Amino acid sequence: MTDCEFGYIYRLAQDYLQCVLQIPQPGSGPSKTSRVLQNVAFSVQKEVEKNLKSCLDNVNVVSVDTARTLFNQVMEKEFEDGIINWGRIVTIFAFEGILIKKLLRQQIAPDVDTYKEISYFVAEFIMNNTGEWIRQNGGWENGFVKKFEPKSGWMTFLEVTGKICEMLSLLKQYC
């Protein structure tokens, strides 16, 4: 992927964490792609946090390095079968949101730019592991947005529900 593509993904990751942390976004706000992603990923994140509360309570994320290590372990398991789809990509963002909330609760000295550091390694993972697939499947606007816009209906709901179940079973391995 190009630097431009990395920048786009990095912006999506930052926008999502700003949404999770309720940080106001200057200017015209997030793009349409970012808004669609926020809606879908936030739904997944809330479901995972609700269903795995006791498990997540036992996970300690005290630094960005700890968050990066845990993120890489979970993503390695998530993608070990080589299958990539939009639902799995959404779970990356949902997990990013879970990590930032855990980190900001447990970090000794939270940094105002912590969300940017998390967004950076998330964007690197997406770029390095799913970038080609994203391109081949219409990109963010012609692939992701068309699939997950609210008008997509039941199929999107069922796919996301399936991804929630997958993420729940993956995270249970770490508790």
From Swiss-Prot:
Sequence motif: BH1, positions: 77-97
Compartments reported by the entry: Cytoplasm
CDD domains: Bcl-2_like (cd06845)
SUPFAM superfamilies listed in its UniProt record: Bcl-2 inhibitors of programmed cell death
Recorded superkingdom: Eukaryota
GO cellular component: cytoplasm; cytosol; mitochondrial outer membrane
Induction and repression of expression: By phorbol ester and inflammatory cytokines, such as TNF or IL1B/interleukin-1 beta, but not by growth factors.
Matches recorded under Gene3D superfamilies: Blc2-like
Keyword entries, A-Z: Apoptosis, Cytoplasm
Tissue occurrence: Seems to be restricted to the hematopoietic compartment. Expressed in peripheral blood, spleen, and bone marrow, at moderate levels in lung, small intestine and testis, at a minimal levels in other tissues. Also found in vascular smooth muscle cells and hematopoietic malignancies.
Record protein name field: Bcl-2-related protein A1
Source organism (scientific name): Homo sapiens
